[in-house]
Amino acid sequence: GQELYKENNIKQNRYIMKDKIKALYGRSLAGQYIKDLESHVLYKHDESGTPGYPYCVAITMYPFLVDGLIKLGGVSVAPTDLKSFCGEFINLVYSISSQFMGAVATPEFLMYLDYFIRKDYGDDYLDHLEDVVEMNAKKRTLVKVIDNYFQQVVHSMNMPAGNRGYQTVFWNISYFD
């Protein structure tokens, strides 16, 4: 089905973008945009998608931290600790990704992960990474607990989902060691 409309969608997407450029920067630059696309000076990813609808998205996580998933149609309130943050974050990314074909970028993820680690384990948690913080059957150090939560998030993002045609989420994260 989608292939039938590909050529028309490309034309529509280019027209929508040309109109926006014209409104912002004038007719000359708008015309140059089309010329540059047609002569392959510019590349625009997946122009054949739904006209006027973005392929990828970068989100701010602040509304999620204040309202949870309620405003996205979910029932989860705002996360209160590291465990609820990681679990709800996974649901957030899957909820957003079901509305876009491309990647979901969450540039604030590590910053808020750090916030909830600090909330649960103290501002000086980096000084106590080797402390045992879980006394269940396996005694776990703080570094292992943090690693497990991070793995939970990453592994969950790699699970195929029905709302994405049984594909995994295309998730962008910046991680610097």
What are the functions of these language-model segments?
Residues 1-177:
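Catalytic alpha/beta active-site cores
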